Design a protein with these regions (language model features):
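Aromatic- and Gly/Pro-enriched helix-to-coil junctions and flexible linker segments
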Residues: 19-138
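Positively charged n-region of N-terminal signal peptides that target proteins for export
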Residues: 1-5
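Bacterial N-terminal signal peptides
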Residues: 7-17
Length: 138
């Protein structure tokens, strides 16, 4: 009986490790390409994108997962995971890109069950967000 418990625990731990590794390394080959736009800035180019899809849940009042998107600094900083949401210069490593591109299971943004109210970003919009991040997220 003890052997069965040990084997079950080891199997569970191995499965969990595989799941966590997959969450940390999303398949970036599925990302839309970065837009070929130069000089993108947060207030003019990015804020309108996130206001439409993200602000209702991640605004100043009771932001989900303590992640606010209502300012440049907050958008980059991230939330309760204490991991930066944006890695300036590296959109492919930025968690916010993984979430809006639906690369992380159960972390799709906006959540799939809320997309009737809050639309998913289009591939073109994700490309603009990627270009802004790749240009330094200024």
């Amino acid at each position: 009986m003890k052997n069965l418990v040990v084997i079950t625990c080891i199997t569970f731990a191995a499965a969990l490790t595989v799941q966590l590794a997959a969450a940390k390394d999303p398949d970036i080959s599925k990302l839309p390409p970065a837009a070929k736009k130069e000089g993108l800035v947060f207030d003019k180019d990015i804020k309108p994108l996130i206001e439409n899809s993200c602000l209702k849940c991640h605004g100043a009042e009771k932001p989900k997962s303590k992640y606010r998107v209502d300012s440049h600094e907050a958008f980059i900083k991230g939330g309760e995971s204490e991991e930066a949401a944006v890695v300036p210069g590296k959109s492919e490593k930025s968690p916010v890109i993984h979430y809006v591109a639906d690369l992380v299971e159960d972390m799709e943004m906006p959540p799939t069950d809320k997309r009737d109210k809050y639309p998913k970003m289009t591939a073109e919009q994700i490309g603009i967000l990627r270009a802004w991040i790749d240009q330094g997220a200024k």
